[in-house]
Amino acid sequence: MDVYFIRILDGQGDYDYDLETPFLEKDDTIKTLKMFESMLYVNSSPVTYYQWFNMLIDIVNTDSPVEPEILFASLKSKDDEAHPKEKLKYDELNYEDVDRYWFWRLDFQIWLKRKELFLVGDDATPQNNDIRRAIDVAEKYVFKRNRSIEHIAPQTPLQEDTLKLEKEDRNCFGNLVMISSEQNSALSNSIYQEKRARVESFLDSSRSGSIESLKMLHAFTFNKSWSLEAIKEHGDTMYKILLQSYD
């Protein structure tokens, strides 16, 4: 039965996950299941870990092997019940009230739909190097714990910023990402252009670092500048992705 559970290959921080099932030929489905279990794991704590762990045990506690697509659908259904769509309210996705679970769920959904979300129009071919690079980064995304909420447009910029926001707009979902405390410290009070340049340097490997939020990747990929209009549009797009994750 333990073959259905993710294993952390390296517990020192730069970890990856492994997952064994009897259906090795279904690589794409197994990867989706592994990513979903990883999302549930990083969202858990020592207190809540066994909630999703027990959900998985209930599904695989059978004499017959469980197909990975059935296991994923069943596990996601149980998670949907634990986090019902009715609790997903845009006004509550703000800096002061948001449950970090929604950021994890959003990153999983962006990973799952990465090609269609980063492609433009009906063309199945990436439009430029930035899009191709973003899809590649999303493909290799790894869920990690120890995340904190960061403002894209900072609360107290280190230098003069032409973007002036009311507190409600600054703290809204469209202006938030969830990253590590280390990256948060490095980026926290930088203006948008500096943050985007730093993320670009992560992408082209000119600076050490990684993309810790697919929501952030999407924002920086499609917005060369940051404005109240861009914040609202990004927030609406991300909220729509969350809603569609229940379909």
Describe the function of each predicted region.
Residues M1-D247:
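Flexible coil/loop and intrinsically disordered segments
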